[in-house]
């Protein structure tokens, strides 16, 4: 009888222990990001709100807290000297996370230099990496490709990007990204493919100008486009002809959206 009582107590303890472990199960997702001006931080915090994941900001020991021009100048000097910024030790143990949303602003066409420091110090082996970034014109595709190259042991997925000028749309656009990729439940409109490319006409040029003229750098001259209709309006994919800073001719893809009765906005450049 005594043996049966002890056995019952043991089984009950095991069940309680397992239940406690389940209730206290640690999250397997981390939102890890660097933000210089606070814009990328807005995306990270919205991600955390939607996913309920852990979150941590990458901090630089000598912050990039100057003007835009001063930051550019510092980065150029660091690149000349082959130097990278020092970052503070992370509080999170990266080894316990299976999925990491890695956020950054785009600098010089790719992920910001503090994230380069991180990538060189941790290989993210067998981790699923979902990039998210903010930018002036573009860089999501190039930075994602660079992460795939620089982190060959990780599973780098297609990421999320948004122009700083459109940060007010982050809730809406992030909601679509998360649902489309199965991170949260819900359905979204499946956009059709872009139409066949055709030469631009005067009306197309006007749309391009309205969308791009306020950007501080020239985006070239539109020569062709494709388009698609959505529930909210029309999306355009312009092919633009321009020149690189060293004078070489280059074609770029300029994505423009025109929501119903709204001003055209360019959403991304792919060079």
Predicted stretch roles:
Residues 180-271:
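N- and C-terminal low-complexity/disordered segments
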Residues 65-68, 167-172, 234:
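Short, solvent-exposed polar/charged micro-motifs at secondary-structure junctions
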Residues 1-5:
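Positively charged n-region of N-terminal signal peptides that target proteins for export
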Residues 9-13, 17-30, 34-45, 49-60, ...:
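FMN-binding flavodoxin-like domain, especially the glycine-rich phosphate-binding loop
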Residues 58-70:
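Short connector loops at secondary-structure junctions
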Residues 39-42, 63-66, 247:
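Short, solvent-exposed loop/turn elements at domain surfaces
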């Amino acid at each position: 009888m005594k043996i049966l009582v002890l056995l019952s107590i043991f089984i009950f303890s095991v069940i309680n222990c397992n239940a406690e472990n389940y209730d206290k199960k640690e999250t397997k997702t981390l939102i890890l990001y660097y933000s210089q001006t606070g814009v990328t931080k807005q995306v990270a915090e919205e991600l955390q709100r939607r996913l309920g994941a852990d979150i941590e900001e990458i901090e630089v020991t000598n912050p990039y807290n100057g003007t835009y021009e001063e930051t550019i100048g510092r980065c150029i000097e660091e690149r000349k000297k082959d130097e990278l910024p020092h970052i503070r030790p992370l509080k999170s143990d990266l080894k316990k996370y299976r999925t990491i949303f890695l956020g950054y602003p785009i600098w010089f066409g790719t992920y910001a230099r503090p994230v380069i420091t991180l990538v060189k110090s941790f290989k993210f082996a067998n981790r699923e990496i979902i990039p998210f970034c903010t930018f002036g014109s573009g860089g999501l595709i190039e930075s994602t490709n660079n992460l795939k190259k620089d982190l060959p042991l990780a599973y780098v997925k297609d990421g999320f990007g948004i122009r700083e000028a459109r940060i007010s749309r982050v809730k809406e656009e992030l909601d679509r990204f998360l649902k489309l990729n199965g991170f949260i439940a819900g359905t979204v409109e499946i956009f059709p493919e872009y139409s066949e490319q055709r030469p631009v006409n005067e009306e197309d040029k006007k749309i391009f100008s309205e969308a791009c003229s306020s950007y501080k750098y020239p985006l070239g001259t539109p020569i062709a486009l494709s388009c698609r209709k959505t529930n909210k309006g029309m999306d355009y994919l312009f092919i633009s002809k321009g020149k690189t800073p060293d004078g070489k001719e280059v074609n770029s893809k300029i994505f423009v959206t025109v929501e119903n009765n709204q001003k055209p906005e360019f959403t991304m450049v792919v060079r």
